[in-house]
């Protein structure tokens, strides 16, 4: 929290001279944005970081309630999470290629099987597909952040519970966001 979203707010202020920002959060970035807004809403008046630092927030494909995570839920259980946390502990992060593989499996008809059939079996040239470029532009996920995200949000669905998650020692509540 302090080294990610809040440090970004400081960097924006330093670069632009503006104290407040408009934020867009996409996918996990949206979940982190919502968490940050709840953290800011919990800060007392006069704190270094307060809710007035963010003027507006726009969310794209963002989950805050993980009770029905869709296809991704197939990949999140205690056993898988333990293996993933063990793997991430070795390097301190999850390689971006792992995230790409999960996205490929979620869109297997578009991202795997259509290429097997059309390119390998039928010998056709692959068509341009913008999702392939997006999926190959991956990001490493910091181990501590990603482990907390998967465990506390996906597995335990704590983000929707007031005080279910504490960031930098502060319990957060999404309902407090204005």
What positions do the PLM features span?
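Catalytic nucleophile loop
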Residues: 1-4, 20-36, 178
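Short, flexible, glycine/charge-rich loop motifs used to bind or transfer phosphoryl groups or to couple energy/partner
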Residues: 12, 46-48, 170-174
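Conserved aromatic-histidine-acidic binding/catalytic patches
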Residues: 20-24, 138, 169
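A glycine-rich phosphate-binding loop feature that marks nucleotide/adenosyl-phosphate handling sites
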Residues: 25-31, 62, 168-171
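Conserved serine/cysteine hydrolase catalytic core
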Residues: 152-178
